[in-house]
Amino acid sequence: MEKVIIVRYCEIHLKGNNRGFFERSFAENMEKALRGIRHEIRKQSGRYLVEGFDEALSEEIVERLSKVFGVHTMSVALSVKSDMDEIFRAVAEVSPSEGTFKVETHRADKKFPLNSMQISAEIGGRLLDYKKGLKVDIHNPQTVIGIDLRENGTALVFNGLIRGAGGMPVGTAGKGMLLISGGIDSPVAGHMIAKRGMKVECIHFHSYPYTNMQAREKVEELASVLAGYTCGTTLNIVKVTHIQEEIHKKCNGEYMVTLLRRFMMRIAERIAKKSGCQCLITGESLGQVASQTIEGMTSSGSVVESLPILRPLCGFDKNEIIERSRAMGAYEISIRPYEDCCTVFLPRHPVIRPKMADILAEEAKLDVEGLIKEAISSLEVLKL
């Protein structure tokens, strides 16, 4: 009797001729997630089995795999010979002592002498005799015992399903550059896009010494949380202090946020292209803050020359975003009270619906290209 973990995937079976590519990416991502743990991953009949591990590490393996996009459900199972006595011993081990239950059997081995219903009925009856605190409920059971009879002469016995992260394997839908701040929104945006199979790289803008090193460390932690779902990531760190000082010195203060965001988008696009990214990703949510009006988004987006901008949070309210932040494990980090660059020289009344003619007039007061080049020269790259 060996403990194994059954991993079932989400949408890969829909991919037709590309299915092999998606399955290989999925298996590679699971291997990366389990790095440092002795194990073997084997594909079997439209699912994967994790085998050969120290049984004391089964919970850690499930925890790691729960962050791998593409995982639909998992089950910690016992692998036994396709023999009714062996199957019953495994069922007795994984089942509770009391409550309601039913047995569900899937019989891939059509040579087995009993059909699925007969197996479920016999095993269920034997379990009732063995554990007097159990009762059968086929409609709304507290426990569902699964039995999978495989074609290789083994049976997998498990108690229930563990929900995975869902989505598609990271790396199957290209690569994008996430503008990540120290707030709640941007890590959630990156998480949502990664769930659809995109590899996510990050870029962060800081204003040291106006912002402190704790603010930077906070962003590194948030990027590390995201990296747990994306099989690692790269964090690009760019200093924009000189840009803010120039805007503060030469431009109407009401346009500080608008002008700074346009610089960020230009810089992000250039670094994204060099890194092989195919889009930019932001945590903007329509109407959530003053700068995130449609006019503000149009202003910042208009400077991006050739990459699409993905804004996955546009239709979410703040509570929905917070729920997702909590679920991914980023919220407690995001709410630490360290300021980011957007709070430096923040005007009392920032322009909410900027007009393009006014923006261009303010921008004409600046050496845009020179400021961009100076910012890019400060680039630091961290592998997480």
Language model region names:
Residues I203-F205, V238-T241, T282-G283, P312, ...:
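Generic beta-strand/beta-sheet core signal
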Residues G183:
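Conserved G/P- and acidic residue-centered "switch" motifs that form tight phosphate/ATP-binding loops
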Residues M1-M177, P187-T233, V351-M356, E380-L384:
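RNA-binding accessory domains that recognize and position tRNA/RNA substrates
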Residues G52-A56, K250-C251, I294-T298, P347-I359:
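Short glycine/threonine-rich loop-to-helix capping motif typified by GTGT followed
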Residues E332, R336-L384:
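The feature marks non-catalytic terminal segments
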Residues L14, V68-L78, K111-F112, H206-R270, ...:
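ATP-dependent adenylate-handling ligase core
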